Amino acid sequence: MKLKMNKACDIASISVLPPRRTGGSSGASASGSVAVAVASQPRSQPLSQSQQSFSQGASASLLHSQSQFSQVSLDDNLLTLLPSPTRDQRFGLHDDSSKRMSSLPASSASCAREESQLQLAKLPSNPVHRWNPSIADTRSGQVTNEDVERKFQHLASSVHKMGMVVDSVQSDVMQLNRAMKEASLDSGSIRQKIAVLESSLQQILKGQDDLKALFGSSTKHNPDQTSVLNSLGSKLNEISSTLATLQTQMQARQLQGDQTTVLNSNASKSNEISSTLATLQTQMQADIRQLRCDVFRVFTKEMEGVVRAIRSVNSRPAAMQMMADQSYQVPVSNGWTQINQTPVAAGRSPMNRAPVAAGRSRMNQLPETKVLSAHLVYPAKVTDLKPKVEQGKVKAAPQKPFASSYYRVAPKQEEVAIRKVNIQVPAKKAPVSIIIESDDDSEGRASCVILKTETGSKEWKVTKQGTEEGLEILRRARKRRRREMQSIVLAS
């Protein structure tokens, strides 16, 4: 187990011994002046330069260093009072004492201490030097007191650091003891388990030996029993193999039965789906046929109403003469119609409806005998119809069938050519243009019935009323047809 040491408690960084002093004379001739300079030099500078590092030390070494320091200070004071030759001798003694202090045993011998050098101020060679004993004594006393205080401070810090080190070591020792106790407990439990295992192994070995002995005795006394046991074992093996084969066969048959049931259920479901689809198809076809018949009937009724409104507008004393071709709506393949327009006498255009196969009807329109210029009007979106105007006769080109899925609305205005009839009236009356358009808004179909006139007399009012009636009829037809289409879409 690793001991966690505190970095601040490094023993090598603690030192209680005083720093080593070094000093020397400049020569034999200037020994007096150097001694005076040493005596008058303040003690704070060398002491501040020499204090660098401290290590662990005992109280005896501290007392010894203090006694040495006091002796050195007394030697310095006496040196200042003696004459120059004596001072020289005492100065030599001071050097010896400093050397002796440096040779004291230190606890921090491992760490390198830096030696501070005392810089002595070289005074000018003056034979007369006055010395003030009172100032020197006070300065030396202050220096010694400061040095002692610093020593005590460093000693207290070193003791504090040593206490921290001891605390950390104590905590590490406690942790080590705790770990040792836990390890001892674990080892005791492991030993108990090992003992139990050894006893169980011994019992197992004894049981094996007993079984071997019993088997050997049984084989020796009854040799026929071994053959019987072998035959019984072979029979048991055969029975187990037959049971396994039977089990596999049963599983295979069960899987086949499940597959047949699944196939039967799928076939029944497919039959149900096909029957429902067939019924839906027949029902949709019947609904489509009925819808075609209803739409065609409604459309023919609306067209008859529009024609009646136009007749009421045009039936005046000075009736205008119109020319149009007789139109027949004949069912053709793909549900389209052919339109033939031929003139009819009596100034009217009656409509004759005759039932035809597939619920269709044939419509004959007989306009007046006199032929006037007539023009076809097509909406902007229509691209399939291409009219041909030749000498007042109009023929509509057949349209291309739409790509519808199930059904197509019975022949309406998109199958009948849209006619624009310009009616010429006698003088003093402006021509009236009647535009008959379909009620469907999709491509290839017109949207309304428009009557145009240029007069401001009573004829304008009549034509306006006819126009409004025709528009109202077309709106109703549109609404009815939209409702029927929505109901068909929802039912499908």
Curated annotation (Swiss-Prot):
* Any single GO CC term annotated in Swiss-Prot or TrEMBL for this entry: nucleus
Tissue specificity comment? Expressed in reproductive organs, but not in vegetative organs.
Looking up InterPro entries in the UniProt record yields: PAIR1
Q: Where is the signal peptide?
A: none
Write out the residue ranges of the motif Nuclear localization signal.
Answer: 479-483
Q: What is its main location?
A: nucleus
Q: Which GO terms describe its biological process?
A: chromosome organization involved in meiotic cell cycle; embryo sac development; megasporogenesis; meiotic DNA double-strand break formation; microsporogenesis
User: Which terms are listed as keywords in the entry?
Assistant: Coiled coil, Meiosis, Nucleus
Localization, UniProt: Nucleus
Taxonomic superkingdom: Eukaryota
Coiled-coil regions listed = 166-186
Q: What does this protein do?
A: Involved in spore formation. Plays an essential role in the establishment of homologous chromosome pairing in early meiosis.
Assembly and interactions?
Interacts with CRC1.
Name of protein = Protein PAIR1
| Naturally occurring in which organism (per UniProt) | Oryza sativa subsp. japonica
Gene this chain is encoded by: PAIR1
